[in-house]
Amino acid sequence: MSETALNEAGPQVLEADGIRIEFGGRQVLSSVYLRVQTGQIVGLLGRNGSGKSVLLQTIFGARAVADASVRVNGRRVVPAFRERGLLNYLPQEPLLPPSLTLARAARLLGVDLENATARFPELRPQFDKRIGELSVGSARLVQALLLLHADTAFSLFDEPFSGVMPVHVETLAEEMQHLKQRKGLLITDHRYAEVLPLCDVVYLLHQGRLLRLDGDVREQLRDYGYLAG
């Protein structure tokens, strides 16, 4: 959805609940309710193995879960990825085929590559390179930028900063802040120092439950043992 159309239509609200998942008899997710709206960056924190990736997969529709409900403005959309222009998803593993050039990948996603990389001039000489020829960090950065600039109402990012050079992490975070004006972002990353300053809302996955943290988020994270005192 274009920025003009979004402003005219008002914010869209993505909600997910009813998600219960067990692995090997261990309940990974229960009592889950999550809300993201356009114009927001929402952070999803939790320890390794807490179910962050599974939750993103379920919201996107890549993982079928009985009784899971994903809604946009109250309308059920399961699987959500089939809803044109609704959302895209960057998993932890590489998303795009390594044989694709950057230019071809951008065309497939309907993204203006010049615009998407405007703050990363060092990527310009690599437009005709295959994604598999890039460094791990550059490939991750490019894929995050392409999904960020793609014309969807929401973007789900699982560890978007992983492997990205620190100087690029800062600029990518600034790009996210800028583009949240026209879409909603749901981000999970173990690098809480980069994620927390970005977020309008923070959720914590703790012992299978999804907790919305209000007030002093860092203090609450310390209380739950997520951050050192």
Language-model features, listed with the residues they occupy:
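ABC ATPase NBD coupling module
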Residues: 63, 74-88, 222
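Helix-to-loop junction immediately C-terminal to a conserved catalytic motif
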Residues: 60
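Conserved beta-strand-loop-alpha-helix hinge in the C-terminal portion
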Residues: 209-229
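Q-loop/switch helix immediately C-terminal to the Walker
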Residues: 93, 98-113
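Conserved structural motif at the start of ABC-family nucleotide-binding domains
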Residues: 14, 29-31
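Walker B catalytic motif
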Residues: 159-160
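The feature captures the beta-strand-to-loop junction immediately N-terminal to the Walker
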Residues: 45-47
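Conserved ABC nucleotide-binding domain
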Residues: 116-136, 151
